[in-house]
């Protein structure tokens, strides 16, 4: 096999549909658009969600709730993840979590949650802790410090 023998796989490349090239082609005259009407016109067609003048679903359904502009979004880390990624006796800070690739960015702070087992002793510095995380960290002799 040489470079000039290479061909695309069977059915991988479809020929372009040439419309408006005479009635013998099967796609002549109206070019597959039917007769007159909005969809036959250039640039014609309706926007997504338009239901022909009937009240659209998005407007029939009621509005609910609001967006709390004061909501804080925390980067969440479980104690089980800390167990896997850090050595015994490590001081874990938000910077260390970013460095090790556990979190991408701090957002409004880091919150440590208590999912998973913990057998190593850590000093964890974070913005928030769940009660179960504090209990697990302290049970193995570590420290949970709020920054």
Curated annotation (Swiss-Prot):
Residues 21-35, 42-52 have a biased composition (Gly residues). One of its GO terms (biological process) is translation. SUPFAM superfamilies: Ribosomal proteins L15p and L18e. Residues 1-58 are annotated as: Disordered. GO terms for molecular function: rRNA binding; structural constituent of ribosome. Keywords: Ribonucleoprotein, Ribosomal protein, RNA-binding, rRNA-binding. It comes from the Bacteria. The keyword tRNA processing does not apply. Residues 1-13 have a biased composition (Basic and acidic residues). GO terms for cellular component: cytosolic large ribosomal subunit. InterPro entries: Ribosomal_uL15, Ribosomal_uL15/eL18, Ribosomal_uL15/eL18_sf, Ribosomal_uL15_bac-type, Ribosomal_uL15_CS. Part of the 50S ribosomal subunit. Belongs to the universal ribosomal protein uL15 family. Binds to the 23S rRNA. This is Large ribosomal subunit protein uL15. It comes from Thermoanaerobacter pseudethanolicus (strain ATCC 33223 / 39E). The gene is rplO.
């Amino acid at each position: 096999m040489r470079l000039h023998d290479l061909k695309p796989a069977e059915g991988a490349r479809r020929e372009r549909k040439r419309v408006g090239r005479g009635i013998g082609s099967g796609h002549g005259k109206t070019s597959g658009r039917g007769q007159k009407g909005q969809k036959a016109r250039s640039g014609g067609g309706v926007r997504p969600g338009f239901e022909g003048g009937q009240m659209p679903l998005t407007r029939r359904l009621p509005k609910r709730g609001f967006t709390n502009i004061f909501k804080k979004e925390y980067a969440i880390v479980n104690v089980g993840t800390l167990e896997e990624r850090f050595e015994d006796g490590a001081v874990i800070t938000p910077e260390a979590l970013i460095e090790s690739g556990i979190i991408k960015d701090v957002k409004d702070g880091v919150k440590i949650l208590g999912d998973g087992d913990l057998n190593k002793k850590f000093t964890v510095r974070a913005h928030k802790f769940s009660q179960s995380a504090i209990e697990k960290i302290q049970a193995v002799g570590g420290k949970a410090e709020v920054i």
